[in-house]
Amino acid sequence: MAETVAVRPAEGRDPGGFAYEDRPRLLEGLRAYGLIVAMWVRSTMAYRASFVMTTLGNLAATAFDFVTIVLMFTHVDALGGYTLPEIALLYGVSATAFGLADLLLGSMERLGRRVRDGTLDTLLVRPVPVLAQVAADRFALRRIGRITQGLAVLAYALFTLDIAWTPLKVAMLPLMVITGAAVFGAVFVSGAAFQFVAQDASQVQSAFTYGGATLLQYPPTIFAKDLVRGVTFVVPLAFVSWLPALYVLGRDYPLDLPRWVAFLTPVVALAFVSWLPALYVLLSLIHI
């Protein structure tokens, strides 16, 4: 059943109080998130030259990751049995999915600082979902540089790879980017919720977000199987790019999982995301 959310009356209505409407809490949070993001975008666009330069700087900084891989391939023909275009596919999917999550929810990593300095309390007294406020706080549009770079590498991979395309493989491409962004977003929120308890755990969170994105840019065959099991069954980062991308490439997964497991990516993303609001609220209540 939808929760009752207090909203301020529109112009021309009784200004003596609040009007109550039946509005789902989720929709109210999305609306608040959109309004806060729009405010930060307008603020960013007030200095367009600065925005362009910082975006280009962000793009250049992230591009060095792939340049490192290219330089590596000047000395070897394959890495873990994978060619440069195949690794470019893994890289492009991981970078694009992470870039989307970082753009939309990257501000969550600052929650620990808010808990420590007490500024989180100012968000708790506002009639807006706290999660929406924290996620949209200081929205950085310059992060589209990472997404642009990831899409460029992905385009290079698709152009150079010789893949026997089927309708399922074509459908898998946008699916793994979208669901991968959802999985990374869930990791961002999980790390932020953990900071209610740990308070100074931003580096731990970064190990799973930025570190996870870097991990997925390389083939799973170069890592120990225990690590591959961990990112498959414990923190399901493997469903971002490894499992679906290996299905597209027609390669077997190191853990000998059946290929249809790649199609569980949306299920895993939904399951991972669905319990996060409850976790966030629970740990915030512990903080209070």
Where are these regions (language model features)?
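A short amphipathic helical element positioned immediately N-terminal to and/or at the very start
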Residues: 29-45
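Membrane-interface helix starts
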Residues: 41-57
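Transmembrane helix-boundary elements of multi-pass transport/secretion proteins
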Residues: 59-95, 254-258
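Membrane-spanning helices that line or support transport/gating and their immediate boundary helices
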Residues: 71, 103, 107-114, 119, ...
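Hydrophobic alpha-helical transmembrane segments of multi-pass membrane transport proteins
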Residues: 87-152
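Alpha-helical transmembrane segments and their short interhelical loops
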Residues: 142-201, 205, 254-264, 272-273, ...
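Transmembrane helix segments
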Residues: 151, 184, 188, 192-248
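Conserved small/polar residues in nucleotide/adenosyl-binding loops
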Residues: 286-288
